[in-house]
């Protein structure tokens, strides 16, 4: 565990501080958590801001059978493992919807505005993922989370 980061998950609560963090990551999918893991390992104060659930789109999948090293688990479980990995290295997770970002060139700081307050950060990584498009065939919803 890094000396700079505390193993903290806000789980819906956000502790405001006037002190900027090193990295704010918008999005808690695989890319967001991969970024958080690398940033925390580099001893950077790191916060993942996610509006939904850990894992992003993969969390809606019933069964994941093609993740290397793990034969079978649910998408929600995989998302939870992403979160636990990042938190175990010191990243903080905040459950909130980002509403905007401002940059102050004089201070060289970003302000990430979200439902739980503002986060000041030296850098921002946007990992906002994708939204699946419906294919448009009859009965499509029946297969959602299984093979679509």
Where are the model-predicted features located?
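Short glycine/serine/threonine-rich phosphate/pyrophosphate-binding segments
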Residues: 30-35, 145
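N-terminal Rossmann-like dinucleotide/flavin-binding domain of flavoprotein oxidoreductases
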Residues: 59-118
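Glycine-centered loop/turn positions within well-structured domains
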Residues: 56, 65, 133
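Gly/Ala-rich phosphate-binding loop of Rossmann-like dinucleotide-binding domains
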Residues: 36, 40
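Glycine-rich Rossmann-fold phosphate-binding loop(s) that bind the pyrophosphate
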Residues: 27-30, 51
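Glycine-rich FAD pyrophosphate-binding loop
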Residues: 41-60
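FAD-binding core/adjacent interface of flavoenzyme oxidoreductases
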Residues: 2-26, 42, 47, 93-148
């Amino acid at each position: 565990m890094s000396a700079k980061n505390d193993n903290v998950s806000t789980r819906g609560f956000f502790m405001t501080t006037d002190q900027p963090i090193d990295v704010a990551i918008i999005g808690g999918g695989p890319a967001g958590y991969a970024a958080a893991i690398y940033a925390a390992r580099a001893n950077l104060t790191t916060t993942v801001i996610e509006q939904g659930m850990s894992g992003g789109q993969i969390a809606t999948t019933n069964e994941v059978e093609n993740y290397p090293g793990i034969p079978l688990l649910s998408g929600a479980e995989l998302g939870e493992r992403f979160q636990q990995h990042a938190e175990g290295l010191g990243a903080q997770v905040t459950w909130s919807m980002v509403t905007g970002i401002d940059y102050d060139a004089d201070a060289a700081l970003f302000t990430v505005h979200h439902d739980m307050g503002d986060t000041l950060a030296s850098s921002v990584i946007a990992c906002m993922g994708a939204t699946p498009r419906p294919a448009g065939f009859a009965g499509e919803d029946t297969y959602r989370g299984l093979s679509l």
